[in-house]
Regions:
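Alpha-helical transmembrane segments of integral membrane proteins
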Residues: 315-516
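Early transmembrane alpha-helices of polytopic membrane proteins
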Residues: 223-226, 265-288, 313-327, 346-352, ...
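Soluble extramembrane regions of membrane proteins in the secretory/endomembrane system
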Residues: 22-261
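Alpha-helical transmembrane segments
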Residues: 13-17, 279-283, 415-419, 477
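Cytosolic-side membrane-insertion boundary helix
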Residues: 246-283, 287-310
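Hydrophobic membrane-insertion alpha-helices, especially the h-region
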Residues: 5-20
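Membrane-interface capping segments at transmembrane-helix boundaries
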Residues: 23, 289-293, 485-492
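N-terminal membrane topogenic signal
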Residues: 1-7, 308
Length: 516
């Protein structure tokens, strides 16, 4: 093991220890349970205010498309830390929910969950705030027709059919760098509400409205933006206590319980530090696994296509894939909303690109059981370690039984694409050659995304989720390539590296996209 790998491992352990420490300092009383209502089996996390703090009210938190309740924990815990009971739920097909997803079912299950909490006396509608992001924001707004609550907060709400009546005390956030269609939705809500109304009398009469544009923010960054959290909590308090001056409520929030008792801002930082710690441990883990698999074999590639030819082939294959998918999605049987489409694109691109470069690609098609076993072990260890940490703190990345079935179906598809990618990129080199190879990789992935983007805007594919997830797809692609190259350098095996890469890809798709 090299010296820098040991140093990285030591730093990783330090970050993990620091992350765990900060998380425990910031912990709030929490209960994980399930709610059976309206034919839905809904996972729910209940967060209580710090010990000794009497709840001032409740907040029900609804996530967006391809998200989950754990992704909403920053906002939920911030509300709980400032004196409100927080109820974060998983909508059908998301997170721990095993119910099939559809937009209508998501609306129905969210409504049933809130009504069940009201009937049981768990929440008081006169003291309850409904907060939703994206799809969850649209659901929260439309629920006003059935379940009027004290206030509604919508973060970048998705396009919707307007409700018959506007929710009481509605606050809408719009991200500065959001999609145009989402910005228009926010403006339409403002027009329907008649513009801003933020006086104390407006809150008392339950007709307050405001549209706040958050500069330097994206659709998903709103979920961890302290400005959004602070303004949301102030809005909730003004709705619950309309007779108290806004300046007084602001001061109370600044001095409130979560900072005093739990140092709540540290939880998110601790979760991120822990994740960085796991990533820093990865080079040492690769070195140990590679040592088990034996000495690296020397890869001697033959003639490869030039960068220009390869990128031309990649663009042509990506466009051919989205055009073919107009006839139907071959992997529809996976029942993953947008995930089946993305996997089908990767499968078609992988097959076409492999056929175009079949001769030299077969030079890499060597099988070594020991190296492939090591790659599989490293792949599963990686997704289990990262998945467990994310599932504990940041996101729902731990596969439940239905998602493991999707993972099994995705793995061979992902391997075809991953092997083709390893073959056309060739073995990792050093210096400028390695940087150029990485640039080609990014360009190939970008071509696939742009093809999906064109399919959405020009071919009416309906796959908006792939567009929304661009940042996550880009970040995953970069980390996937760095990790795969680290293994390939140490083993000299394209097939083993492809297996490792395929495990990561199958895990990502089966985790992120909703079940249908």
């Amino acid at each position: 093991m090299k010296r820098w790998e040991i140093i990285f491992a030591a730093v990783g352990l330090l970050f993990l220890a620091l992350g765990v420490r900060w998380i425990h300092v910031a912990e709030l009383p929490k209960q994980e349970t399930w709610l059976d209502a309206g034919g839905c089996h809904t996972p729910i996390t209940i967060l209580e205010p710090p010990a000794g703090v009497q709840p001032a009210g409740s907040v029900v938190v609804l996530h967006g498309l391809s998200a989950n309740r754990r992704l909403m924990m920053y906002l939920a815990e911030d509300f709980a830390g400032h004196g409100l009971r927080a109820f974060a739920i998983d909508l059908p097909g998301h997170g721990d929910s095993k119910d099939a997803f559809s937009f209508a079912r998501a609306q129905r299950c969210a409504t049933a969950a809130v009504e069940s909490l009201i009937r049981s006396g768990t929440i008081d509608p006169k003291k309850t705030i409904l907060l939703g992001h994206s799809m969850g924001g649209a659901i929260a707004i439309r629920m006003a027709d059935r379940d009027p609550l004290a206030a509604t907060i919508a973060l970048s709400p998705a396009p919707m059919t307007m409700p018959q009546r506007m929710p009481a005390n509605l606050l809408v956030f719009s991200a500065g760098a959001d999609l145009d269609v989402l910005k228009r939705t926010a403006q339409d809500l403002s027009a329907a509400a008649g513009g801003a109304r933020t006086a104390s009398d407006d809150f008392a009469q339950q007709r307050a409205f405001d549209l706040q544009t958050v500069p330097y923010s994206t659709h998903t960054s709103l979920l961890s933006d302290h400005r959004v959290a602070h303004q949301s909590e102030l809005w909730a308090m003004r709705a619950l206590f309309p007779n108290i001056a806004a300046d007084t409520l602001t001061l109370n929030l600044d001095l409130a319980t979560y900072e005093t008792f739990g140092n709540g801002r540290r939880r998110l930082a601790g979760a991120i530090f822990g994740l960085l710690g796991i990533l820093a441990l990865f080079p040492a883990a690769v070195a140990l696994v590679a040592k088990f698999s034996g000495p690296a074999q020397i890869e001697s590639p033959g003639t490869r296509p030039t960068a220009t030819l390869l990128l031309t082939e990649g663009a042509a294959c990506a466009m051919a894939a989205v055009l073919l998918l107009m006839l139907g999605v071959p992997l529809h049987f996976l029942h993953l909303y947008a995930g089946a489409y993305l996997a089908s694109v990767l499968l078609i691109v992988g097959i076409l690109l492999l056929l175009l470069n079949f001769g030299f690609a077969m030079e890499y098609a060597t099988f070594n059981g020991k190296r492939c076993a090591a790659a599989a072990f490293l792949g599963f260890a990686t997704i289990l370690a990262i998945g467990a940490w994310l599932n504990w703190q940041l996101d729902d990345a731990w596969l439940n039984a239905p998602r493991w079935l999707r993972f099994a179906g995705l793995l061979p598809v992902a391997w075809i694409f991953a092997f083709t990618e390893e073959a056309v990129l060739g073995p990792p080199r050093h210096g400028k050659q390695r940087a150029a190879r990485f640039a080609i990789f990014l360009s190939l992935r970008l071509e696939i995304f742009l093809a999906c983007l064109l399919a959405y805007y020009l071919l009416a594919s309906g796959q908006v989720l792939i567009v929304i997830l661009f940042v996550y797809l880009a970040l995953f692609s970069i980390l996937q390539r760095l990790a795969t190259d680290a293994l390939r350098v140490r083993t000299g095996s394209a097939t083993a590296a492809a297996l490792f890469s395929a495990i990561l890809a199958a895990w990502f798709i089966s985790t992120v996209f909703p079940l249908t």
